[in-house]
């Protein structure tokens, strides 16, 4: 008779990040030190298996990419650097890695239509408690670095730069 041994994992070692707003800050911290996204990137970059799993899933989700026809031809080039297809692929990886993604939507000067769409590195975005304002920082680890704020994407208020923000639903977790 053969025996089967199961390797166990100490689940208590793996903790989900805390999301909380400090009294003197407008944004919600992403982890106890507000650097949890960098931890996720580090895992992604240092583990060949983890990297292969996520990039493999990204490839499957992306498939043949976006097929843009008709009126969407206007968005084939979402901005001067990226096509909408390239932005879509970046958002897929952010969704898999962080559980969310963010887009910067820039309205034309007249306020009639979207002029440009940019992918925003999700690791550099924080939100306020009710997800109506977003904060971008290239270096969250540096307390002196500049934080830029944006309003939530609102097709009724067609002005300036706004953020379209998607985050996976997690029961009992705010923002």
Give short role names for the model-derived ranges:
Residues 1-175:
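Structured, contiguous alpha/beta core segments that scaffold functional sites
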